[in-house]
């Protein structure tokens, strides 16, 4: 199997012929190949985006986050996740030291997460140490994690992030949360509170 920069030889996945890859995404691609996969484009696009991530630690940690639940991958290789925010779409917390590149903040340094908003911070404003559990950065979570943050009166959002913007997967919460430097709010699912397949 060869598609773009992704090649499978003897049940091993390579990127650009030399980088041997592993983890839940590789397992998923191999399973899809074994079952007569019809469209590998989302997975191969995801791998290409992942390999653009400047941190090898971030790449390895992202596998653990995606391994918790198979979060959906879009046709262009981005990943869908969840975010819990306040009823008025402002983040639950704010940080005066976070350098916001794109997005609206208030006087408490919270970030507005309305549908259609793209939120971006400088990558160095996002803690890359997975052992720092409650720390600075933009947080995305599994359905369960984000739904807990949304609580009964908050908003549960569907967000999309590029694997190249993943920074760290904190070791607490059973790898259910991820810190990123950028994401886009794609939908408010507060009324349905329905987890994607």
Regions found by a protein language model. Give the residues of each.
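Generic low-polarity alpha-helical segments
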Residues: 6-7, 59, 138-139
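Long, low-complexity intrinsically disordered regions
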Residues: 195-197
């Amino acid at each position: 199997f060869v598609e773009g920069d992704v090649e499978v030889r003897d049940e091993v996945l390579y990127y650009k012929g030399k980088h041997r890859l592993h983890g839940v995404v590789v397992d998923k691609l191999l399973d899809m190949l074994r079952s007569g996969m019809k469209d590998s484009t989302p997975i191969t696009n995801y791998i290409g985006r992942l390999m653009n991530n400047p941190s090898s630690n971030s790449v390895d940690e992202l596998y653990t986050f995606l391994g918790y639940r198979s979060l959906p991958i879009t046709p262009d290789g981005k990943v869908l996740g969840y975010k819990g925010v306040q009823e008025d779409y402002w983040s639950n917390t704010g940080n005066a030291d976070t350098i916001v590149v794109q997005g609206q903040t208030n006087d408490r340094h919270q970030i507005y997460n309305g549908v259609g908003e793209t939120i971006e911070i400088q990558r160095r404003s996002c803690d890359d140490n997975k052992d720092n559990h409650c720390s600075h950065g933009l947080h995305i979570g599994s359905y369960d994690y984000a739904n807990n943050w949304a609580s009964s009166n908050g908003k549960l959002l569907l967000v999309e992030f590029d694997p190249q913007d993943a920074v760290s997967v904190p070791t607490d919460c059973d790898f259910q949360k991820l810190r990123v430097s950028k994401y886009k709010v794609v939908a408010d699912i507060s009324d349905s509170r329905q987890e994607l397949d």
